[in-house]
Structures are given as C-alpha cells and as structure tokens.
C-alpha cells in the first residue's frame, strides 16, 4: 500500500483523481472539488475590465481577431488553435448554439439549421435580386422579415443577419478575452469598402448585439493597407480584395504615415461562395448526366457536395488536378450511388472564368476615379483567400501590369489593420493618419424622379455638404425627403436608404420656400441627413436607417437573446465540467475500491458502490446541483476507506493510527501498513 500512496502523491494535483487521494487520507469534504466547483460557478463577468480595442475582420467565410501588442498587431488563435474562425452558426437538435469549427463540422448532418455566408444578406431586402439568387444556392431558409429585410430561419426561429453576425462576433470577443485575460468591450470592425449605408449600419448593430462598443467601421482594403504600411512603406498602392463573398479594390497613397484612399470600387456579391456554387452546379449536372439523378433537391447531398467543392477549390490552388470522391451520395432502386470525378485546374478555371472576369471592370473604374494610370501604381496587394487562386493572380498581373506583392497574409491582414486602427483611436499609435472615402454617391430624389447628388463617390470622409431646394407645388406645407445612394441617374435605380418629412412649411408659391438639405457622413461612413426650412428655422434630422434595418427595440431584444445564449453556453460548460469531474472521481473511487475491498467491511464497500451508482445516475441528467451533491456524497463515502485504514482495522497500523480516524491522519502512518 505504501507504493500505492506514494504514486498517488506524485500525481498532478490539478487532476480530479487527487480528490480520491484526499478521501483516502480521511478528508470528508475534498477541498479540491469544492474549489473546482466555485471556479466553475464564477461568471464570465469576473474578468477584470480591459480597455483594449480589438480589431475584427467579420468575413463571409472566415473571421479573424487581432489586438495591438506594443506597436505591433497580433492575430489571436481561437479555442481550437486556429488563427481564423469559420463564420458559420448552427443550432443543433437540442437547440444549442454552435459557432465556428464545431458548427461547420456538423453541417452535413444538419444542413437546414446551419447558417453561413450571411454577410451577403446583411442590410439587404428580401426582394433584392441578389437575395433571391442566394436563396437558390443555400440549404437553409431565407425568409422575409416583417420590415421587408432578408432574414434566415433555423430550428423554426427567425434571425436577422445582424444577429448571426453577432454570434460570430461574440466568438471573436471571447477569443480575445481568453488571450488577454480581461473583458473586452471595444472593437473596430471591418466591412467591404463597397458596402452601402444600410449594410454598414447593420454591421454596427451586429457589434451592439454582441455587447461591443463599435469604435469604428473601417473598410477592408484600407485595413489591409494599414497592416502593409506599418513598416514605413510608401507609395501608391492598389489593394485587390477578393474574399468569401465580396470583392473590393482600392487605390491608396501612403506618405509620411498618412494613408489616403484615392478611390474605391467593388462588387458586394462576388467571392469564394460564387466559385463554390459554380463548382457545385458542375458536380450536380455531371452526376445527372452520368447517373440520371438530380441531386439539387437533396439538401444532405448538396451540403456534402458544397464541402467537396470548397476542398477541391483550395487544393487546385496548389495542384494541377484533384479527386472528388463522395461514396453513397444517394441511392435508387438499383442500390447506392457514388460520385467520383477527377477535376483539373484548367476545367475549374473554365468554370469560374466568368466570375474572375467580373473583377476587371471595378479595377478599371477605380483607377479612373483615382485619376491614376497603371504605371503610377507602385505595388498591388492581394487580400482575401480567393487571391490564392493562380488564375486570379494572373488576371491581377494583366490588369495592373505587375506581379502582385506577397507582402501581407491574405487571411489576416484585414484584422491586423483593424487592430492598428484601434491603436490609433486609443492613442497608442500616433504616427499614422487614415483618410478614407465614401464608396457611393449620396443624394435625394427631386422633381421627375431624378437622383440629385449632394456628395459624390470617393469623397474623403468625414464630410458634410448642404444644398438648398424648394417646393414643387403652390402652398406646399411639407416635403418628403428620399435619401438615396448609388450611381444611376434615376432615383428608382439607386438604393433608397430612408425617407422622412419636413413639416410646417408656411404656405407660399412654389419655388419660394428655401429648404436646406445637409448630408453628414461620419468616419464610419454612416450618414445623417437633416432638412431645414430657412424661413422658420424648423429642422428635421435622421440618422439613416433603411426602411428595413433594425429598430432600437429589436436591437435591445437581440442583445438580451445574445446574453441568454451566453448564459446557456456557460450553464452547458458548467454541466460538462462537473460531469467530467464526476467521471474522473468515479474512476478513482472504483480503482481504490478494487485495491482495498478485502481490507474494509462489506457494508462500507456496499455504501461506496451505492454512492457511485447514485452519482452515475445523476450524471445522466442535466441537474448540476444534483450531480454536485452526489459527487460530494461519493467522496464522503470513499473517505471511509481512509478512516478505516487509519483506524487500525486492518490490524497493521501503529498506535498512533488508532486515534479515531481523524480528518488529517499523518501520512507516515499509512506507509507502515503492509499489504
């Protein structure tokens, strides 16, 4: 027995086995278990408050979080050890929320309740042609919200894209908190440069729902340029950003620490998801041609095909061909069917060529708007996972006439740039200044349905612009102001951001009243519009929310739901931890009982076995208090082995060992017991 006790003493005190050892020495209430439980019960909010501003790249496919360490940004690894986190959210059969890799792993078996790529829906209307196109490509439901926005449905419940984004942001926030060891409440979040006002506002709402004070919304290409330019690099830079769901191109001038965006352009519905979908269509059609079976209606098969398409796309960036092998993809009367296709890089490039071609026009427009020629561009930065595709790099070379730089990590540069912007806002980084632009023209609808611009695209922000308008009819006492964003000449062809009325205008002949309309764009690119009757001084002002968008009440409700999810997650973690602790304790007790059964009375052994049985039964339930109670009871029961041995019942202990089996029997006495 001496050898047994010595080996127990050598074990890691942090293991739950130690509680069994403490029981053997006669402690009726193991301090370790109590301490572990109190640790589990401690809420997340006990972290000391920090004032770090984290940088988050909220991506369509993957997200990334970074923080400034001294003068340099550091990308933080998540709980799975990865530097990027899949922007995937799932609700399993128990209604539990899964985010990131765990959500992506179960997508094949739970396709209708696994939501991904919602960044493409954020700030969009349900009737938008792009939304309708997306609906045909995803296995989950996209539904029309009461306000007309596009929302998603999972487990019978509807969620706004901002909410789904908030679940991902919460994961990034927790990743940063685990690394920093303190709570985080401030963030800089990136968005595609070509996002309109509604999309920017919806992204800011997502941050609020996640419990973050969004200090700044920053454009992704600008963030990447910040990351690149940290090391005193200067010149005219083109940033080509092709990500999972969006495409942006920006021209920036870096000089003496000033990052000035000259122009930006893009396509908010072009990215890796479209490449996957093109490959998915090919696989479905190929299987239909060879097997005469249409897989497009089989959600489970489609999800397997989607995963295979994404994997093949990644592999073809470094190899010339790949095998797509999916056994038992479906079955018919003749039996199981398997999909086996060899895909070459040239075939893949042919399938996606029309998508790559779509990047050319925005690049040319951007160069034109910036008033620079190709030869003026000193360097081209590639950002976004899709820029690893060799054909994309070839097109970039053709557009800009020079090989793109590998100076930044395509997956991490944006988050690092966001962290740098956080450092600038906090005052830690003093030598850098960022001057960004508004991507789209802003204006109002005037007589005849004309779009009258007040602020042209690529105007440096923040900015403010006023213009005087008048009434279109005699004795008009109110005017409706329709706020629009876009580049088309007719108001109806542009994106309507919102509308409001200026009332109480004194009756007068048309053209006489003077109504001053002012547009104010802040550094986030978010618009405030005011209209003022110059004769009365009456003013009406709104911060633009699209006719959809989330109301304050809805945001508050979603914040509460997010807190509830966090509470449920904590309860689930507590349950798992206490079950693990109980499982380890059972193993230790049974091992001890096996070793000492013959040296203790049978009724003591029976009592221990019953306590273990009760603990096992409690473990199968979800009542944490019940498991804790049975765990304490089991530890108390097994302590009787120690009491019995120290009480001299085995006949081999010294006189000192017969002192009533006190709580803390000296260890030396046990070593005198012979087996």
From Swiss-Prot:
Native organism: Phaseolus vulgaris
Biased composition annotated in UniProt, kind: Acidic residues: 666-675
One GO CC term on file: mitochondrion
Residue stretches of biased makeup (Gly residues): 648-663
Family in the record: Belongs to the heat shock protein 70 family.
Keywords in alphabetical order: ATP-binding, Mitochondrion, Nucleotide-binding, Stress response, Transit peptide
Start and end residues of each stretch annotated as Disordered: 638-675
GO-annotated molecular function: ATP binding; ATP-dependent protein folding chaperone; unfolded protein binding
NCBIfam families the record matches: PRK00290.1 (NF001413), PRK05183.1 (NF003520), prok_dnaK (TIGR02350)
Principal location class: mitochondrion
The protein, known as: Heat shock 70 kDa protein, mitochondrial
Compartments, as annotated in UniProt: Mitochondrion
One Pfam family named in its UniProt record: HSP70
Residue range of the transit peptide in the UniProt record, numbered on this chain: 1-51
PROSITE patterns on file: HSP70_1, HSP70_2, HSP70_3
Superkingdom of source: Eukaryota
């Amino acid at each position: 027995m001496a050898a047994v006790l010595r080996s127990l003493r050598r074990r890691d005190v942090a293991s739950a086995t130690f509680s069994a050892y403490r029981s053997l020495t006669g402690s009726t209430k193991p301090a370790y278990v109590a301490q572990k439980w109190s640790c589990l019960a401690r809420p997340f909010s006990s972290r000391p408050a920090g004032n770090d501003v984290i940088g988050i790249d909220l991506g369509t496919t993957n997200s990334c979080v970074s923080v400034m360490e001294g003068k340099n940004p550091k990308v933080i690894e998540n709980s799975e050890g990865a530097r990027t986190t899949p922007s995937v959210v799932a609700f399993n059969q128990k209604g539990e929320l899964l985010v990131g890799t765990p959500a992506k792993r179960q997508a094949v078996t739970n396709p209708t309740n696994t939501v991904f790529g919602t960044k493409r829906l954020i700030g969009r209307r349900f009737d938008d042609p792009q939304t309708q196109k997306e609906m045909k490509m995803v296995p989950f439901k996209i539904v029309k919200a009461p306000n007309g926005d596009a929302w998603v449905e999972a487990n019978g419940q509807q969620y706004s894209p901002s909410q789904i984004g908030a679940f991902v942001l919460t994961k990034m926030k927790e990743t940063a908190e685990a690394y920093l060891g303190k709570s985080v409440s401030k963030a800089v979040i990136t968005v595609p440069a070509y996002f309109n006002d509604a999309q920017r506002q919806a992204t800011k709402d997502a941050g609020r729902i996640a419990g973050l004070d969004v200090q700044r919304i920053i454009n992704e290409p600008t963030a990447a340029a910040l990351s690149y330019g940290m090391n005193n690099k200067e010149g005219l830079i083109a940033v080509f950003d092709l990500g999972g769901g969006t495409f942006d191109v920006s021209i920036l001038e870096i000089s003496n620490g000033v990052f000035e965006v000259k122009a930006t352009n893009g396509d908010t519905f072009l990215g890796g998801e479209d490449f996957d979908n093109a490959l998915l269509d090919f696989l479905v059609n190929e299987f239909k041609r060879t097997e005469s079976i249409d897989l497009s209606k089989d959600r489970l098969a489609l999800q397997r095909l989607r995963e295979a398409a994404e994997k093949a796309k990644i592999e073809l960036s470094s190899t010339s061909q790949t095998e797509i092998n999916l056994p038992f993809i479906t079955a018919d009367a003749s039996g199981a069917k398997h999909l086996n296709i060899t895909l070459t890089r040239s075939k893949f490039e042919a399938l996606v060529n029309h998508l790559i071609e779509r990047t050319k026009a925005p690049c040319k427009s951007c160069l034109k708007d910036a008033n620079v020629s190709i030869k003026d561009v000193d360097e081209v930065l590639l950002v976004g996972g899709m820029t690893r595709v060799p054909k994309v790099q070839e097109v970039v070379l053709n557009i800009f006439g020079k090989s793109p730089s590998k100076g930044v990590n395509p997956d991490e540069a944006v988050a690092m740039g966001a962290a740098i912007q956080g450092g600038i806002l906090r005052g830690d980084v003093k030598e850098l200044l960022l001057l960004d632009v508004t991507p789209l023209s802003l204006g109002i609808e005037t007589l005849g349905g004309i779009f009258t611009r007040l602020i042209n695209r690529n105007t440096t922000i923040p900015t403010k612009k006023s213009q005087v308008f008048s009434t279109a009819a005699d004795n008009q006492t109110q005017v409706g102001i329709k706020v629009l964003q876009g580049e088309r000449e007719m108001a109806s062809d542009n994106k309507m951001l919102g509308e409001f009325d200026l009332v109480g205008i004194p009756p007068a002949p048309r053209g006489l009243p003077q109504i001053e309309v002012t547009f104010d764009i802040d550094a986030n690119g978010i618009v405030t519009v005011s209209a003022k009757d110059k004769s009365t001084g009456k003013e009406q002002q709104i911060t633009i929310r699209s006719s959809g968008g989330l109301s304050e009440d809805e945001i508050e409700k979603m914040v509460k739901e997010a807190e509830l999810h966090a509470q449920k997650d904590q309860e689930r973690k507590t349950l798992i931890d206490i079950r693990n602790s109980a499982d380890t304790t059972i193993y230790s007790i049974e091992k001890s009982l096996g070793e000492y059964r013959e040296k203790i009375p049978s009724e003591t052994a029976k009592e221990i076995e019953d306590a273990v049985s009760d603990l096992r039964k409690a473990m199968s339930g979800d009542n944490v208090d019940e498991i804790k109670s049975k765990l304490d009871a089991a530890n108390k029961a097994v302590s009787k082995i120690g009491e019995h041995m120290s009480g001299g019942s085995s006949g081999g202990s010294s006189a000192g060992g017969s002192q009533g089996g006190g709580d803390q029997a000296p260890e030396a006495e046990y070593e005198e017991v012979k087996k």
